[in-house]
């Protein structure tokens, strides 16, 4: 709930509400009472219903998604980072996928509309999109000479996903990565390779505000100055 005028999560949830999404599940750690306290006591939401799922240990993004399995009905659902502000139009595009899919953001738009420097953007994962608009692969931190990095249009994953409940079976199969974490990207790979799942990619030419670090507060606060969150 890092503040940028109002707690940042208010802006994130408000964008989802603007996109027509009324049910939100926030995954928290066992000691993370700040979000629970904020949304249940200090500032209850008016446009959404917020529930909480607990991830017992910070084992990675695939484990965080798996922790929410009991809170998700048997219908497609979105997964997104709580430290990113996605434009409502991008959230709406993700919701309209209606199955497995990913919203990919144009690298140049992240620089132009989100105030990120080019070097930072190119450290994000690049999306390899097949000719039919489906996901072929995601490349984490590609080398500068990688063909994806050399393309005129580069598409970046900012972790705005649409999933069916089949993703939970894939999350269960994930093994720790080189970083020792259970990565959501690996669950997606398993879903495609072993479970026969196809992921549609929606291209979005807009910025995503990233509040991963304290140093981001100034830029994010400036960009959200005219936004009044109404979660």
Predicted feature residues:
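N-terminal glycine-rich phosphate-binding loop and ensuing alpha1 helix
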Residues: 1-36, 48-50, 55
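Glycine-rich, basic loop-to-helix element that forms the pyrophosphate-binding segment
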Residues: 60-67
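Active-site acidic Asp-centered loop
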Residues: 80-82
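Conserved beta-strand scaffold positions in the cores of enzyme catalytic domains, especially
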Residues: 1, 52, 100-102, 201, ...
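Conserved core of the sugar-phosphate nucleotidyltransferase
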Residues: 87-165, 169
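Conserved alpha/beta core of the MobA/IspD/sugar-nucleotide pyrophosphorylase nucleotidyltransferase superfamily
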Residues: 136-231
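Short aromatic/hydrophobic "clamp" motif used to bind/position activated sugar donors
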Residues: 77
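Short, aromatic/basic amphipathic alpha-helical patches
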Residues: 36-44
């Amino acid at each position: 709930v890092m503040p940028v005028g109002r707690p940042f999560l208010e802006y994130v949830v408000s964008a989802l509400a603007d996109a027509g999404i009324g049910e939100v599940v926030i995954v928290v750690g066992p000691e993370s009472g700040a979000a629970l306290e904020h949304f249940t006591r200090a500032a209850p939401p008016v446009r959404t219903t917020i529930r909480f799922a607990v991830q017992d240990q910070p084992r990675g993004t695939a484990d965080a998604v798996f922790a929410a399995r009991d809170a998700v009905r048997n219908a497609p659902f979105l997964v997104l980072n709580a430290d990113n502000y996605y434009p409502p139009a991008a959230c709406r595009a993700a919701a309209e996928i209606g199955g497995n899919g990913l919203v990919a953001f144009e690298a140049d738009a992240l620089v132009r509309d989100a105030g990120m420097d080019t070097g930072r953007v190119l450290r994000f994962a690049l999306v390899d999109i097949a000719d039919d608009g489906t996901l072929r692969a995601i490349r984490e931190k590609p080398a500068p000479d990688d063909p994806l990095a050399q393309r005129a249009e580069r598409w970046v994953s900012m972790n705005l996903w649409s999933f069916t409940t089949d993703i939970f079976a894939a999350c269960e199969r994930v093994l720790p990565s080189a970083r020792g974490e259970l990565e959501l990207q690996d669950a997606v790979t398993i879903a495609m390779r072993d479970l026969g799942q196809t992921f549609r990619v929606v291209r979005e030419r807009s910025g995503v505000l990233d509040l991963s670090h304290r140093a981001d507060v100034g830029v994010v606060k400036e960009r959200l100055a005219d936004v009044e969150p109404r979660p």
